[in-house]
């Protein structure tokens, strides 16, 4: 028993020292840091004073009284004085926590109005009222209880506790009035702070998403429109004189005859950024877009990679008519078929120019764009790209690259992967293909068709190709880039309806300018995000900081103070509990728990407020400079 008493005394002494030092550091931080000397922190200053007094008189005196077998040996006056100070400080702590909760609540709910109202003088008056009410209440009830009741002092000489505890109804009424009512008010305010903080956070997230969407829409990307059906083929006249042209430089190549093998790997897929308009493009009567021809050659080129794919051109055209207009901005890749294979090393004629590889580029709608377009039955069909090259087995036939718009994204992705493998093989054999001359003929066609299959989600190619206008070659041939501007239903020569792409030419300089504008818009968006972050720190962070402060302070307050008031209420109604050692032990523990809140509060400030944390850390390191 003696060892336990010594250990308890040492622990309580340590707890008292920690309480005094911690709260003195909080008070000192007000003197050292002007940023802490704000009206909202006056309540924390008041709470630190009450905790300091508990560390000076509450913990050591009650420990001595408990170790002396709950016998008071210092007289009645000191007993009443100690009880008065102890209860006044404890109730002042309760009301101070209530003041902190109310202050944080109005700081979040009505920030502008409350900040104008919350002047230093008014906050000081509130703190004075917080201390004045407990002082009057407990001074009168403790010192004057015998006088008001007419019974005089009813305690023995060795007893020391408040006399109104002997009246269970008065005792319970006082506890309900100044603790339980206050506790429920604080919980209600805490719930209001939580809802306000959550609402501000949700509003901030919605603004951020809208900002991201606007930033995405500002980028120069592909916009695909679907117009109403009923348009005929005369809606797009064969006139491209007013269209600006976007050329991709490609070195010459020739066509040679090869044996047909299994399907190889098509060329890679590149991503192309363009904003499209409803300009016109030359169409043939068979809905073919005529590309610039290449010079004829005696040899013919038959690539098995494209021959097998060309057999798939027999797919039926879609007869579905769009019924609404949808605009979508997304990044669409370009398909650039480049024939390359190990067996093509002799495909060039020595009289031809070197590096001629006509690249056919057609942006297509990616999977994300397709998924966003699905809104009606007539719009649920999306497009992907299938490439084939029609090969003539005649002596002077020319290779005709064909692009078919289909709706099977999985097959298109597989073809795109094969394109990448052919691209790698072509790079390996590039030195062997350094021949002079131009290819004979080579009319480029684009045939548009739709299958009845629905698109399936797939990953889009992540590769990009940036064309630089600086690398010019006299032998280079400029091949125009085809940019999709509108998808509409037209009537074919057979009377059926097919979907046709109205295309236009865009110049490379315009694309370069758009790239620069894109970078500029990204920088502007970053600046806007930075300003958004600053605004967020002034509004949403205020609510989050208030919620964090109240969570630590109010949470520790409820956990540590509630047990005492529960047992104290029972103590007034239970006569047998007073003589029960186990109940008295629980009562003593609950009393100590109330004291335990005082050394924890400084750490709660540090965890809830970064400015307090910085200043307290500086104080404990021995830095007492005033800033």
From Swiss-Prot:
This protein's UniProt keywords: Cell membrane, Cell projection, Disulfide bond, G-protein coupled receptor, Membrane, Receptor, Transducer, Transmembrane, Transmembrane helix
GO process annotations (BP): adenylate cyclase-inhibiting G protein-coupled acetylcholine receptor signaling pathway; chemical synaptic transmission; G protein-coupled receptor signaling pathway; G protein-coupled receptor signaling pathway, coupled to cyclic nucleotide second messenger; negative regulation of synaptic transmission, cholinergic; response to xenobiotic stimulus
Membrane topology term: Multi-pass membrane protein
Composition skew (Low complexity), residue ranges: 231-264
One Gene Ontology term, aspect cellular component: synapse
SS bonds (residue pairs): 79-160
Protein name: Muscarinic acetylcholine receptor gar-2
